[in-house]
Curated annotation (Swiss-Prot):
CDD domains: PROF
SUPFAM superfamilies: Profilin (actin-binding protein)
One term under GO cellular component: cytoskeleton
Name listed for the protein in its UniProt record: Profilin-1
PROSITE patterns xref list: PROFILIN
Modifications after synthesis and translation: Phosphorylated by MAP kinases.
Gene3D superfamilies found in the cross-reference section: Dynein light chain 2a, cytoplasmic (3.30.450.30)
Subcellular location: Cytoplasm, Cytoskeleton
Positions carrying Phosphothreonine: T114
Keyword terms: Actin-binding, Allergen, Cytoplasm, Cytoskeleton, Disulfide bond, Phosphoprotein
Function, in words: Binds to actin and affects the structure of the cytoskeleton. At high concentrations, profilin prevents the polymerization of actin, whereas it enhances it at low concentrations.
Assembly description: Occurs in many kinds of cells as a complex with monomeric actin in a 1:1 ratio.
An MF annotation (GO) of this entry: actin monomer binding
Amino acid sequence: MSWQAYVDDHLMCDIEGHEGHRLTAAAIVGHDGSVWAQSATFPQFKPEEMNGIMTDFNEPGHLAPTGLHLGGTKYMVIQGEAGAVIRGKKGSGGITIKKTGQALVFGIYEESVTPGQCNMVVERLGDYLLEQGL
């Protein structure tokens, strides 16, 4: 399966039991900031934004004072799982980022998708990739 198929079929799909509800944008990005696959709607990000995200995984709490920035959008960092998951909130939407051995799995959502639904979709794929040694 191609990386794009993982994004299309496992991240940008309808939320289980909620037809028509899906993430706004999603991507799989290598730890080095290289995009493996992304939805057409995933924001163009700056290298320093990705560096900040990677630093927060290695030093949990790094982004809390300044917020998480991606594609020029600022998210307030909310409780995640140190070294494994970063979660951010902006208005009625937000972002979930799951770290695997080699990649970061991103999910961005807006109203109609709940934070819990985004977490479930992103973390399920991230956990699967971890099980595969990725």
